[in-house]
């Protein structure tokens, strides 16, 4: 049987990405449906989440599915020593699809190999976050009218930021130029720079973050410095306030610039930026609903044509 799990965005072709964006567009037109009536979606969150969990659960509910799961592994048998495999096998008895976030890199891949139902990776450590990438791509497409030939600036925690790792891989199909802005301690890992070279992705690196640096940006993708990824809190304190985007820095940026952020924000975007029309991070979060509706349907074998026909009911 075909494994329809979504573990990494790197497994999606250009055609598949554009197909899912078309499906998300259909769900934005009509988000409330019964196309998943009778299905059960399990959300297993071994690591904290607000937006990802709520948007997946809302996506499932709005499509007629039922949701089961947990948000705190301490209240499950994993706190008694149950293995990830046993948890996955047990939940597979009750659900048609499992959406899982885990603190270990590679956990989603492992789950997809042992589970009899599809797995959607909702984030595995500092590794990948493919559903966030789909909503990021949808946000970029909506605001720029294209995914092709864009200047994309990634700012902040590029070492542990799984969202930027996934976005970089997805954009390989669209001839981007990436600009990595990070302190030395949080630079883009070497493996992703090698990936860029192997896939002929242009990139530049900076440590300065100012209005001159970002003047040519089409997309400015801000990230928070993730305290939970640091083993050395002194290192975290050194870098947590390094880059803060302020409204005055946007005065001479391109008119089409949009600011994205996977959220939650800590202090890397000043609150005065929220009122700037170039700020798009709250709309970006809303786009997560439509992107995740598309992901759930695709993984469960529902086609774009099914979605279009369903809208006529």
UniProtKB/Swiss-Prot annotation:
Q: Provide one Gene Ontology biological process annotation.
A: 'de novo' UMP biosynthetic process
Q: In which pathway does it act?
A: Pyrimidine metabolism; UMP biosynthesis via de novo pathway; (S)-dihydroorotate from bicarbonate: step 2/3
Domain of life (superkingdom) = Bacteria
- The UniProt record lists the keyword Transferase: yes
The residues listed in the UniProt record as binding L-aspartate, with positions renumbered to this chain, are 80, 162, 224
Q: Which GO terms describe its molecular function?
A: amino acid binding; aspartate carbamoyltransferase activity
Protein transport in keyword set: no
- What catalytic activity does the UniProt entry give for this protein? carbamoyl phosphate + L-aspartate = N-carbamoyl-L-aspartate + phosphate + H(+)
- Which PANTHER family does this chain map to? ASPARTATE CARBAMOYLTRANSFERASE, ORNITHINE CARBAMOYLTRANSFERASE, MITOCHONDRIAL
Oligomeric state and interaction partners are given as: Heterododecamer (2C3:3R2) of six catalytic PyrB chains organized as two trimers (C3), and six regulatory PyrI chains organized as three dimers (R2).
- In its UniProt entry, what is this protein called? Aspartate carbamoyltransferase catalytic subunit
- Lineage, broadest ranks: Bacteria, Pseudomonadati, Bacteroidota, Bacteroidia, Bacteroidales
């Amino acid at each position: 049987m075909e494994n329809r799990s979504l573990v990494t965005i790197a497994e999606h072709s250009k055609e598949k990405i554009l197909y899912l964006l078309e499906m998300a567009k259909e769900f934005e037109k009509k988000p409330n449906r019964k196309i998943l009536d009778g299905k059960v979606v399990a959300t297993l969150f071994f690591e904290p989440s607000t937006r990802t969990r709520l948007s997946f659960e809302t996506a499932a509910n709005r499509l007629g599915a039922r949701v089961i799961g947990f948000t705190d592994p301490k209240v499950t048998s994993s706190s008694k020593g149950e293995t990830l495999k046993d948890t996955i096998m047990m939940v597979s008895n009750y659900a048609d699809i499992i959406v899982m976030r885990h603190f270990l890199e590679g956990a989603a891949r492992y789950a997809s190999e042992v589970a009899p139902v599809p797995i959607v990776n909702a984030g595995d450590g500092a590794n990948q976050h493919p559903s966030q990438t789909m909503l990021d791509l949808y946000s970029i497409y909506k605001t720029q009218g294209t995914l092709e030939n864009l200047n994309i600036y990634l700012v902040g925690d590029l070492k542990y930021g799984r969202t930027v790792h996934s976005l970089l891989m997805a954009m390989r199909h669209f001839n981007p130029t990436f600009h990595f802005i990070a302190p030395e301690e949080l630079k883009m890992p070497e493996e992703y720079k090698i990936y860029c070279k192997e896939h002929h992705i242009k990139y530049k690196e900076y440590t300065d973050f100012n209005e001159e640096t970002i003047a040519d940006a089409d997309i400015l993708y801000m990230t928070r410095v993730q305290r939970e990824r640091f083993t050395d809190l002194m290192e975290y304190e050194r870098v947590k306030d390094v880059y803060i985007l302020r409204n005055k820095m946007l005065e001479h940026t391109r008119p089409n610039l949009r600011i994205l952020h996977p959220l939650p924000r800590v202090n890397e975007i000043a609150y005065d930026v929220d009122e700037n029309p170039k700020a798009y991070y709250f709309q970006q979060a809303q786009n997560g609903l439509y992107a995740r509706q598309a992901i759930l349907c695709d993984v469960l074998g529902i086609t774009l044509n099914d979605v279009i026909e369903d809208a006529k009911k």
